[in-house]
Amino acid sequence: MLASHFKLSSVLSPRTDEEKQYMSHVPYENAVGNLMYAMVSTRPDISHAVGVVSRFMTNPGKEHWQAVKWVLRYLRATSDRCIVFNGNSSEGSVCGYVDADYAGDLDKRRSTTGYVFTLAGGAISWMSKLKKQLHCPLLKPNI
């Protein structure tokens, strides 16, 4: 859901005292916390974006803040959208979807995987998770 032009990494974090001073007045943590609440409560569609922007909570830069504001604008523009359970739907079974961003974490080259399960057209379970470590079976030592 985060626009493809946002290539966020720790390289974009403030380096100078002036940049750090500017970002100290930005309510980044508060905004990301509000996004987390919306994600958990009613908006599973922003799970990936929230996971990405939350990686920079300790030292966010201006580009990170721009991404948070983009997600907030997305929520405002789609505030009429909601999870609907259609009782008349022919979709009486659970349906699942999965996706991954394959090394989308530009700092540590880790992937994010997510899934969503729906019933009668409405999301009933969802998750988005950053992998803890890189797994590459080709790099295992021969024993």
Model feature map: region roles:
Residues 1-143:
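Divalent metal-binding acidic/histidine catalytic loops
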